[in-house]
């Protein structure tokens, strides 16, 4: 309690020492020291984290110099002091974003900026497709064109097929005039008649090649057959025609037979056909 009373008593004494004249406020006197450094202890105290627990410094023990004189003019409040600029923190909130620091801290980059692509690649995942203009979906149009290109099969009546088959048996190839005459008689187009004759010729060629191959196989199998004598019981021989040029040096033996062992060529010379 005693210290508070001493502080309160010291305020009027300070008013007698300091002179609040226009010259002292404007700093015109050469002998008087500037008053600005006296405000630094208060700023240091306000910027400290634990200002209440810290002990006051040596310069802080005379708060009488900050007490306003009730009889003199009021000193301007320290709130109106120009804030100290900190370039590393950027522009203050009240400045409205003006100045070079605001333009440097803007997060938006134009697409033509060289760092724009690097930033986009860093933000987008590796497997995600990059955003771009959507390609038109032409799947439906392609399917429609594919369906239109597919040829339809012409269905012929029995009378038309009979007339076409009869003409094909007589002549495999038709001239343009014959094709036009046949198409007009059957109420068909020349393209339909031409396509039918092409398919019929292909079928006819396949049939010919199959028949020729079957004939060749039969002829080859007939050439490999050779007649040989077969032995049945009672030594009866089944006479099979064998060329006389075939001769075997080893004699043939027949069981339970009265014939002597003779060479095969001698046996066939004695047999009557």
Curated annotation (Swiss-Prot):
One of its GO terms (biological process) is inner ear morphogenesis. It is found in: Nucleus. Keywords: Developmental protein, Differentiation, DNA-binding, Homeobox, Neurogenesis, Nucleus, Transcription, Transcription regulation. Residues 114-123 have a biased composition (Basic and acidic residues). Disruption phenotype: Mice display a perturbation in cell fate determination in the lateral aspect of the otic epithelium results in reduced cell proliferation in epithelial cells, which includes the vestibular sensory patches and semicircular duct fusion plates, as well as in the adjacent mesenchyme. SUPFAM superfamilies: Homeodomain-like (SSF46689). InterPro entries: HD, HD_metazoa, HMX_Homeobox_TF, Homeobox_CS, Homeodomain-like_sf. Pfam families: Homeodomain. Transcription factor involved in specification of neuronal cell types and which is required for inner ear and hypothalamus development. This is Homeobox protein HMX2. It comes from Mus musculus (Mouse). The lineage of its organism: Eukaryota, Metazoa, Chordata, Craniata, Vertebrata.
């Amino acid at each position: 309690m005693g210290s508070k009373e001493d502080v309160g008593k010291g305020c009027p004494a300070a008013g007698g020492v300091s002179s609040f004249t226009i010259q002292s406020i404007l700093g015109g006197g050469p002998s008087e020291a500037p008053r600005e450094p006296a405000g630094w202890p208060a700023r240091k105290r306000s910027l400290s984290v634990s200002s209440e627990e810290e002990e006051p410094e040596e310069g802080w023990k005379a708060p009488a110099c900050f007490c306003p004189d009730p009889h003199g003019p009021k000193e301007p409040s320290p709130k109106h002091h120009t804030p100290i600029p900190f370039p590393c923190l950027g522009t203050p909130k009240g400045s409205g974003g003006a100045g070079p620091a605001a333009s440097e801290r803007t997060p938006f980059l134009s697409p033509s900026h060289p760092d724009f692509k690097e930033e986009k690649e860093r933000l987008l995942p590796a497997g995600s497709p990059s955003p771009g203009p959507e390609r038109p979906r032409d799947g439906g149009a392609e399917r429609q064109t594919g369906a239109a290109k597919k040829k339809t099969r012409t269905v012929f009546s029995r009378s038309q097929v009979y007339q076409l088959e009869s003409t094909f048996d007589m002549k495999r190839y038709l001239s343009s005039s014959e094709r036009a005459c046949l198409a007009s008689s059957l109420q068909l187009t020349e393209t339909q008649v031409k396509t039918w004759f092409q398919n019929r010729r292909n079928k006819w060629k396949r049939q010919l090649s199959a028949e020729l191959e079957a004939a060749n196989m039969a002829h080859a199998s007939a050439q490999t057959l050779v007649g040989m004598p077969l032995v049945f019981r009672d030594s009866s021989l089944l006479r099979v025609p064998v060329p006389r040029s075939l001769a075997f040096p080893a004699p043939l033996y027949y069981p339970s037979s009265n014939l002597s062992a003779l060479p095969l060529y001698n046996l066939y010379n004695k047999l009557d056909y």
